[in-house]
Amino acid sequence: MSKKIPSALLLNDIHVSKDNIPEFQKNWDEALYICDQYGIEDMIIGGDLWLSRSSQTLSTLMAVRQAIIKATKAGISITVAEGNHCKVDQESVLGYSHLFSEYPHVYVVDDYSIINISNDVELYIMSYFPENGSFVERLKKMVKAELNASVHN
């Protein structure tokens, strides 16, 4: 019987806002606890870290900043893909999470990124782009350029 070992913690639709900072902090701490209990070193946010695409309050930005610092100090690398709630301009690669893209062990996905989960598994992560906009072409380009037939994708 094989033992299953978690490789990463995947999170989506966190939707942090000025109105739910305590809940965000509690959920983040729970995620860090899970990472600690299972020896997980990679946290991957697949989109919608933020609730509002129009603006972020300073308290919301600081809560996310503190959460990111707490995670990276615990030895956890964070990858963030921008969701539709994370971008003012839906076709731009830039979103609110790019404020933290230069932090150590924080990786913010521009269009797409590939994470090697194990020797035979690659996880493809794409930031949000509108379905009636550039999404389909970006996806086709990624598949054509990056799909690796020698591993599970």
Question: Which residues does each predicted region cover?
Answer:
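Core catalytic region of metal-dependent phosphoesterases/phosphodiesterases
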Residues: 2-7, 14-115
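A fold-wide structural signal in alpha/beta-hydrolase
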Residues: 7-9, 122
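His/acidic metal-ligating clusters that form di-metal
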Residues: 38, 119-153
